Amino acid sequence: MKALEVDNAQNIRTAFFISDGTAITAETLGRAILSQFASVPFETRVLPYVDNLERAEDAVVQINTAYQRDGLLPLVFDTIVSPEIREKINSAHSCNLDMYEGLIGRVAEETGVEPDGHSGHAHDNVDSETYKERIDAVHFALDNDDGARTRHYHAADIILIGVSRSGKTPTSLYLALQFGIRAANYPLTEEDLNDNQLPKALREHKHKLFGLIIDTDRLVKIRQERRAGSRYSSYQQCQQEQRAIQGIYTSQGIPSLDVSEMSVEEIATRILQMTGLKRRIG
């Protein structure tokens, strides 16, 4: 289909993650695919619980509106089971990437069994204990974010450390949400780094520590978005902190990972691989 002639100088393309459930699967797989096209600017939207024709029609309106605005066919990643709802979504002006249809067809061909075709079966089979593990892990990550409540570190599976704005919080939450890992995180301050040793709160939990490293240029850019023109976001300060923290990682024997060019999904997966931590869910 020919693109509309609109003012979209940056060629931003909209990507939708749509599901009749939480949309976590559609979003996770979709973002993994989009990450392979780093040069393309995407605006993403998540539409969960599109489980009836009325909601599907609303999704179609949003997709068509994005097409009218961008002049480019939106990419639609969906995990919708119902053929009727899927057909309605497919009627939109979009490039539809159905994540179930092709896979279910292959499984049916291999097993010789036709799929039920009912939405929600995956959710019916979810173990309530798995749900509890996920929620407990998320609560733990939130309660133990940014050095809060260090008295609970005995219950942590892992404690992420690093300088301010190095990705500790999003990684902790992703580990909790996707894998049920109880992840705390602790920022090493300038005072900690000047002492060239671990803070007292971390010493007895040294075996749980994992360090994040971020490129100085990347760190400057992130901090400038928060406090432009400050000493905190200056190149000299960021470089000094990075050198100091890498020295601590080395002297204390703390495993670490350079996360400068990684997505949070990649960071979390690499951490599990490097530490041998076992996921509690998934």
From Swiss-Prot:
It catalyses: [pyruvate, water dikinase] + ADP = [pyruvate, water dikinase]-phosphate + AMP + H(+); [pyruvate, water dikinase]-phosphate + phosphate + H(+) = [pyruvate, water dikinase] + diphosphate. Pfam families: Kinase-PPPase. Its EC number is 2.7.11.33, 2.7.4.28. GO terms for molecular function: ADP binding; ATP binding; phosphotransferase activity, phosphate group as acceptor; protein serine/threonine kinase activity. It is an enzyme of class 2 (transferase). ADP binds at residues 162-169. The keyword Nucleotide-binding applies. Keywords: Kinase, Nucleotide-binding, Serine/threonine-protein kinase, Transferase. InterPro entries: Kinase-pyrophosphorylase (IPR005177), PSRP (IPR026530). Belongs to the pyruvate, phosphate/water dikinase regulatory protein family. PSRP subfamily. Bifunctional serine/threonine kinase and phosphorylase involved in the regulation of the phosphoenolpyruvate synthase (PEPS) by catalyzing its phosphorylation/dephosphorylation. PANTHER family: PYRUVATE, PHOSPHATE DIKINASE REGULATORY PROTEIN 1, CHLOROPLASTIC (PTHR31756:SF3). This is Putative phosphoenolpyruvate synthase regulatory protein. It comes from Psychrobacter arcticus (strain DSM 17307 / VKM B-2377 / 273-4).
